[in-house]
Amino acid sequence: DGILKAKTEMFEQAMPGAQIIVNGDDDKLITLKSRTPKPTFFGLDSSLDLYAEHVENLGLGGSRCDFVTKAGRFTALIPIPGHHMVYNALAGTAVGLALGLTLREIQAGIEALKPVSGRNHLIHTEKWDILDDCYNANPVSMAASLDVLTNALGRKVAILGDMGELGENEKLLHYNVGCHAADDHIDAIFAVGELSRELVKGVQAKDPEGRLICRHFAAKAELLTAL
């Protein structure tokens, strides 16, 4: 609720005629539909102002879907993996329409997307495919990255570190990520850092039989030696 309050401060500061774009699939944000100025809502629900349908998961190759807007519809390939990227593309579509771009221009922009270092950046090497999503990680982004990893072929190894600035619930949030990781059918989980001990506890709680390889390291040097 505190985060919602902070995010809605923009309504109070918005200039007349301002356009505010929010995720309509978010249970908290959808409560803003009666606010002024009226937001534009995006998501996967067909009742929203713009939405995506027929979403096709292409694994590490990204996803393809149809974008439905009041100005028309188009199909686009999102070249960055992860279901959450559909929401990012929807948000970009809403902004593009607000700025007067054509649907063709928006489609071209989506298909030209390139990841930045540390944000869902797929690195191909002779031996491994590495998904680099380490910049300023939070529980939502880490869970999303783990979901992306499940789409990879071959053996899947997650190397996870501490997430900072999570407040008084930091241990529980790390524990929950561990539970999520155990459910994602990853072959091995290596965790490094003090808070990541809780992450390992979450994995072990969901995998009491030890099906997963799960190890904790106090420092990066120990992890590198093990790798």
Where would I find each of the regions flagged by the language model?
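Glycine-rich phosphate/pyrophosphate-binding beta-alpha loops
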Residues: 116-118, 134-144
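Glycine-rich phosphate/diphosphate-binding loops that line cofactor/substrate pockets in enzymes
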Residues: 148-157, 227
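Acidic, Mg2+-coordinating active-site environments of NTP-dependent enzymes
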Residues: 1-129, 154, 179-182, 186-188, ...
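Short acidic-hydrophobic, aromatic-tinged amphipathic segments that line or gate anion-handling sites
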Residues: 212-223
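Residue-level marker for buried hydrophobic side chains located in beta-strands
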Residues: 130, 158-159
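Short, intrinsically disordered, charge-balanced linker/junction segments flanking boundaries
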Residues: 1, 221-227
